[in-house]
Amino acid sequence: MAEDHTFTLNGDERWLVRFTTLEGGAYGYTYSQKSKRPRILIHDGLRGRHRLTIIVHELLHALYPSASVEHTEQAGKDIAKVLWCLSY
């Protein structure tokens, strides 16, 4: 069953964050603010630090759509590592 949350990002953009089953082995997807319904989908089977890393990674795609995948992967890992060590 999907778990939905709505957030305002980039000041005034309404984003849906949905935890749901994803097909094809993906852990997350970000559908840009250029779509009618900007949203982030996160695989609902993720737990712990891996889940946090994917959430941060997908949020970085939403906030910085022109950033490279390499940048969002490394920044996502680094931010998640700090948050995890601080018990968030």
Model-identified regions with their sequence ranges:
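Catalytic zinc-binding patch centered on the HExxH motif and its immediate surroundings
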Residues: M1-R39
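Low-complexity, intrinsically disordered short peptide segments enriched in small/polar/basic residues
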Residues: R14, R37-R39, T53, G76-I79
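Alpha-helical, largely C-terminal catalytic domains
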Residues: T20-E23, D44, T72
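Walker B catalytic acidic pair
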Residues: E58
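Short alpha-helical functional segments enriched in proximate histidine and acidic residues
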Residues: A62
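Post-HExxH zinc-binding segment in Zn-dependent metallohydrolases
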Residues: S66-Y88
